[in-house]
Amino acid sequence: MPIDSSPLPCSVLLLSGGRGQRMGGQDKGLLEWRGQPLIAHLQRLARPLTDDLIISCNRNPERYADYADQLVNDDSPDFPGPLAGIRAGLAAARHEHLLILPCDVPHIDAPLLADLRETARRNLLLPVMVRHGEFWEPLICIIPTRLRAAVEDAWHAGERSPRKIFLQLGGVGLECPADDPRLANLNTPQLLQTPSGVSE
């Protein structure tokens, strides 16, 4: 029987529901970088990968609607962190795997996502996270939606760290270079204003 080498079908969740503290409380996904909102850069990358593009947003749904097939929001009003958006995405996802990306990593490219999907295809029952050096990136990951109940259990037990939960569930790492520029977070006004979007 031939080995299936087709890309892993995924729903995609773009996380844009945070408080934006480092941005002065602004809605980070709508801030402009290179002439477009951050969310537009991620949407353009993710759109070819799925027929189920979900955006987690807690503000301005009318501005996000054109970028998504579904919008979700947290079930708590106090910006409880990215795990709340992940929970909402897992509940809404139409495929058996959910690829998760934060809105502030516009340097992410298609080859990295292809590697992530291939690693997930080889580890169908486990969360797969990007890892660079000693650091895990739990918000750049693919998680089987069948793990939703385990994530819910951890949430109700008080855990709020996606990294801890995914590692407890047997998380696998996609190794990237320690200084991989594709993983740069544009999470301050200064980084948004630099030409490269990478700190000097």
Swiss-Prot record:
Domain of life: Bacteria
Annotated GO biological process: bis(molybdopterin guanine dinucleotide)molybdenum biosynthetic process
Intracellular or extracellular location(s): Cytoplasm
Name by which UniProt lists this protein: Molybdenum cofactor guanylyltransferase
Naturally occurring in which organism (per UniProt): Pseudomonas fluorescens (strain SBW25)
This protein's domain notes: The N-terminal domain determines nucleotide recognition and specific binding, while the C-terminal domain determines the specific binding to the target protein.
Quaternary structure and partners: Monomer.
List of residues binding GTP: L15, S16, G17, K28, D74, D104
InterPro entries hit by this protein: MobA-like_NTP_Trfase, Molybde_CF_guanTrfase, Nucleotide-diphossugar_trans
Positions contributing to Mg(2+) binding: D104
Similarity comment: Belongs to the MobA family.
